[in-house]
Curated annotation (Swiss-Prot):
Localization per Swiss-Prot or TrEMBL: Cytoplasm
Keyword terms: Cytoplasm, Elongation factor, Protein biosynthesis
Major site of localization recorded for this protein: cytoplasm
PROSITE patterns reported for this sequence: EF_TS_1 (PS01126), EF_TS_2 (PS01127)
Organism encoding this protein: Blochmanniella pennsylvanica (strain BPEN)
Record protein name field: Elongation factor Ts
Organism lineage string: Bacteria, Pseudomonadati, Pseudomonadota, Gammaproteobacteria, Enterobacterales
Function: Associates with the EF-Tu.GDP complex and induces the exchange of GDP to GTP. It remains bound to the aminoacyl-tRNA.EF-Tu.GTP complex up to the GTP hydrolysis stage on the ribosome.
Gene name of this polypeptide: tsf
Length: 272
């Protein structure tokens, strides 16, 4: 007897992927086995080894780890955030080995696209979900290049990677990375702060001062002082260096003839 050929609509595959987070090939096979019945395909998946992945795919993943890897020549580096649901799994060696494999692969293959990286590890992620019983998410990563890269990771919760040029040493780059981890600047220099951000903050501080009953001239002076503090909070070079609070980061960079060209800072679960 001739075997019946079943044509599966691509929209049906997309819907099954959306509802299960399973790969295209597996979804197509499941739909063929279920004669195109979406709900039956899901039921069959849940009965199979993909059951846990289907069940867990919508869970929030706010735990996990931050990892950083830099090439031996210190000129190319990657920082990544991979999430799970609990600290228990985050500390599990299997989860940590998965994270290590992901970042090393991204580094060696010079992957720049998060979608490519997620697809590359789709099967391994699904298997890990089934093994540890929690959803796993390769959430984000950043690539930095430069004359000299440094990094720092604090307890797998905060990660920093910095690109610099000049008379750079590994120890100094680590200390600058530690400073960024602790102080969380948003920009390198005052000139990097968008004009609309400065105008908005200045207007807010001026309004606050004027509403307190101060004259316009005094309000301007108060606003100038508050804007100075504002820049100290968000601009790296204006901050006091945590290793020597008697000097600013800007003074440190001048002293050692160093220029910070770029940096990135990840904090686990931020903006989720």
């Amino acid at each position: 007897m001739k075997e019946k050929i079943i044509n599966i609509n691509s929209d049906l595959i997309k819907e099954l992927r959306k509802r299960t987070s399973i790969g295209v090939v597996e979804c197509k096979q499941a739909l063929i086995k279920a004669n195109g019945d979406l709900e039956l395909a899901i039921d069959n998946m849940r009965r199979s080894g993909l059951k846990t992945a289907c069940k867990k795919s919508g869970h929030i993943t706010s735990s996990g780890l931050i990892a950083v890897e830099i090439t031996s020549n210190k000129q190319y580096g990657i920082m990544i955030e991979i999430n799970c649901e609990t600290d228990f799994v985050a500390k599990d060696s299997t989860f940590q080995e998965f994270a290590k494999t992901v970042i090393i692969t991204a580094l060696n293959e010079k992957i720049h696209d998060i979608n490519i990286l997620q697809t590359r590890f789709k099967e391994q992620r699904t298997n890990l979900i089934a093994q540890v019983g929690e959803n796993i998410n390769i959430r984000r990563f950043v690539v930095l290049t430069g004359d000299f890269l440094g990094c720092y990771v604090h307890g797998f919760k905060i990660g920093v990677i910095v690109a610099a040029s000049g008379n750079v040493t590994a120890d100094l780059m680590k200390h600058i990375s530690m400073h960024i981890a602790a102080k969380n600047p948003k920009y390198i220099n005052v000139n990097d702060v968008p004009r609309n951000v400065i105008i908005r903050e200045n207007n807010i501080q001026m309004d606050i001062a004027m509403k307190s009953g101060k004259s316009y001239k005094i309000s301007e002076k108060i606003t100038a002082g508050r804007m100075s503090k504002f820049f100290n909070d968000i601009v790296l070079t204006k901050q006091n260096f945590i290793m020597d609070i008697n000097k600013t980061v800007e003074e440190l960079l001048i002293e050692y003839h160093i220029k910070i060209n770029n940096f990135a800072r990840f904090e686990l679960g931020e903006d989720m």
